[in-house]
């Protein structure tokens, strides 16, 4: 990665200004960037695109004073479905914080103006070579295609029609939908060709995922209303929504390939190097720090401080990730907050709040740094103690304590343990911790594999036929670097000339097992592809030394492989059943198959009902009971297509493919599978959920795991039945009876509380005192809830006719407070002000109307003093 020494022709600041100036000249209102915290969508964690602040306009629930708008929107993607945090800093274009250039038409102009202005801006203002630009359109969008080819003059060979490449009607990279129903329409994307020296093919080609052709601008034309049945109707007033990544455009205009080489990042990377003392400006940790200072500073400016929940937890994760990378560079004292001044200098003109909030941002980040550096030191002490004496495994309870009590990142614990040749026992982690572990592990493996450089021959895979093989070590790696040997305690990657280990692919995880060579023992924790035909065996040397050239006995873990193949074969049967029960529109969107379960994502626009789940389970288990043999045949693609085998949209296949037949299912698949369907044993769906618009997820278990799941449910039912003194078959009826009894008792309790309140109300009247002719009462009402307080208050107001009342009750340490003022006294005393005065003294707050208000508190020990203070408060106002 190069680092510019001169000012580029178009700085990031220039690009922002010229974009807004251009669209202002076209009659657009320049709209300021909205907060990173969406104000109109509680379901969205962060503003992740320019259109978020206009969502209500598109939905028809809001109307602006303008019909054309342009903005440069600050965006953040970290957390939720847009969680790419582990990739940030390791790829050329992944960021947490980024800026989105956009222009919008709310029922005004449409495709012709949008595309022509986009072309004019790119070629006339930014001076991009016309022969470097490509465009895509939705396959049926003849209007957009004609505008590109006949009016703008883009050669037809550089305008690509994109069909429904996501498995269902209108499920396309070039068809945008806000949700399952509602506004939608085709889009036209503009791509920039970085040149033949970069790998990758044009959009729509099998090689489109390469880095040569980069999407820079998307023009969305909202012209339809998606109906519940999947049909579309024209919108009365079509709209335009466009978005162009500022960082991507800057990389092109500044003639660099990575976003981290543009002027803003170049300056921030140098600032991070200054504060950490790192000399290598290409160090990925510096890129992480440079990215994260933007995200965290803008979040603080928008009111998001680090915490342990919601947006605050995402903020804390980002901050601590940056600090961890500084720690890796040897920085043991707070440094991150010192970059705020650099950021304010670089981006303060575009975002003035960075300057006005600079001191507050710096203070918040510094406090979090100081807290976490203290946590790091404590965590390291705990780790050192736990690993003393040659321990080979960090106990799961210790790892959980580090994470839960000290906020110690799980990946940091694992990093320290790997350096010492120690594994982490993750059994004690709950499901949320397991999910977090898998995400970090998957991201870490990807980065490591991509870093390995292997120029030798491919290995022979024998894992379809056998699970044990004699093989020769042809390469060894430690920390991504080729080595001649791996010694005891060292983690690394082993490449063999022949292997029975399956490498992670097609959703199936890689095999586990062991490599034995004399007294040397290498525990394989995972198997991943270095290249398509080169498998890397990831693990740790537990005994002896492995050398390049050694012969080893490679043994796959039989139990783990058996459980994994059961789940994989069941996934094929489930896919077939899903299409039969839900419809042929069902297409695979993603999968994860391991020894514990199978997770399958598929295209479908509605939740799968309980009855449908039962039908799917019945069909899969019927295939299992038939116990038919499976068959795998390698053939030409043309022959495979003739067999009717299912092929996944977007999947890359070679000239030779493997057709797998399992029961009535036939798919292309390179994974490992059972010999007969009966080997699966039992199939049970355990979860169904939505993961994105038009995408559902099913999770299922098989074999012993399915039996264990059902036995667990049985134990729960039996325990519940025992508690209710009923048999399992009587449980539902008994629960209904108990619920009826509870409702009856609740009514009785409410009636008794009302009687109690009435009797106490008479007694309380005697406690009222006079303040300048105004009756005032401030007292406890024992055993009352909020409803009883209100009812008693109403009765007191009826009886006394004129006065001010405060009633309070305590439940545990929680305080409920009611304040009431008769109609003739509200000009003197407001109930809302009075209840807040009392509530603040017991650690709470509240509100309401002038004549009645409620509040809560958390410090019951101060209630009596708070009630006594009412006399003085009313006296001041009477």
From Swiss-Prot:
GO terms for cellular component: cytosol. SUPFAM superfamilies: Class II aaRS and biotin synthetases, Putative anticodon-binding domain of alanyl-tRNA synthetase (AlaRS), ThrRS/AlaRS common domain, Translation proteins. Its main location: cytoplasm. Gene3D superfamilies: 2.40.30.130, 3.10.310.40, 3.30.54.20, 6.10.250.550, Bira Bifunctional Protein, Domain 2, Threonyl-trna Synthetase, Chain A, domain 2. It is found in: Cytoplasm. It is an enzyme of class 6 (ligase). Binds 1 zinc ion per subunit. Catalyzes the attachment of alanine to tRNA(Ala) in a two-step reaction: alanine is first activated by ATP to form Ala-AMP and then transferred to the acceptor end of tRNA(Ala). Also edits incorrectly charged Ser-tRNA(Ala) and Gly-tRNA(Ala) via its editing domain. NCBIfam families: alaS (TIGR00344). This is Alanine--tRNA ligase. The gene is alaS.
